[in-house]
């Protein structure tokens, strides 16, 4: 018991002092010098993450509220569907028209090929060459084209004189060819 009384006396003998946090300063300073940048970047990252989450939450709330408002407006949905259907119908009609035009062209080409084969067969039966009759038909079309253009052909002048040689530099005007310099352009030999 006396030991306990002695401990109390010692505590009572020491006047109470205000304890400050100066004993933490060296450890905090050491921690900040070692990990200060990591701590700063971590705080900035957390701040940016919070901002991003707030934006995404607010955008989902506005989408859900606007989606519910659109769902309540049945008339606009019906009008949009009808416009979409009319657009699809119009595009399908255009495609059908193009397909019909293509089929017509194909039919005409097949008819032309069939007619040419018949003409070739008939000419072979008569003992004539099919190519000869094709050349005659081509000459007839050329004669018709030449008769429609009455312009006489003029003699063309040659572009260069007959003595021109691009390698010799003769008859060259202001520029002539010269070989390039030898060696490095910046100079300086090892």
From Swiss-Prot:
Residue ranges of the TM segments: 30-50
Protein's recorded name: Selenoprotein S
Low complexity: compositionally biased ranges: 58-68
Family: Belongs to the selenoprotein S family.
Organism phylogeny: Eukaryota, Metazoa, Chordata, Craniata, Vertebrata
GO biological process, one term: endoplasmic reticulum unfolded protein response
Region (Disordered): 1-20, 58-190
Any one annotated GO CC term: cytoplasmic microtubule
Membrane topology: Single-pass membrane protein
Compositionally biased region (Polar residues): 136-151
Localization in the cell: Endoplasmic reticulum membrane; Cytoplasm
InterPro entries: Selenoprotein_S (IPR009703)
Location, primary (coarse class): endoplasmic reticulum
Lineage: superkingdom: Eukaryota
Matches recorded under Pfam families: Selenoprotein_S
Keywords (A to Z) from UniProt: Cytoplasm, Endoplasmic reticulum, Membrane, Selenocysteine, Transmembrane, Transmembrane helix
């Amino acid at each position: 018991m006396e030991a306990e009384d002695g401990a109390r006396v010692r505590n009572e003998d020491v006047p109470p002092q205000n304890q400050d946090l100066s004993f933490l300063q060296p450890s905090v300073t050491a921690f900040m010098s070692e990990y200060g940048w990591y701590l700063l970047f971590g705080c900035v990252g957390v701040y940016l993450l919070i901002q991003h989450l707030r934006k995404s939450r607010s955008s989902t709330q506005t989408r859900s509220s606007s989606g519910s408002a659109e769902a309540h407006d049945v008339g606009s949905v019906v009008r949009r569907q009808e416009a979409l259907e009319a657009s699809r119908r119009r595009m399908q009609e255009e495609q059908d028209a193009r397909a019909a035009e293509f089929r017509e062209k194909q039919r005409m080409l097949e008819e032309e090929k069939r007619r040419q084969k018949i003409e070739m067969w008939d000419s072979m039966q008569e003992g004539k060459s099919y190519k000869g009759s094709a050349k005659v038909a081509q000459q007839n079309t050329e004669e018709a084209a030449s008769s429609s253009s009455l312009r006489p052909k003029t003699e063309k002048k040659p572009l260069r004189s007959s003595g021109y040689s691009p390698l010799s530099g003769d008859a060259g005007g202001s520029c002539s060819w010269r070989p390039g310099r030898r060696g490095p352009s910046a100079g300086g030999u090892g």
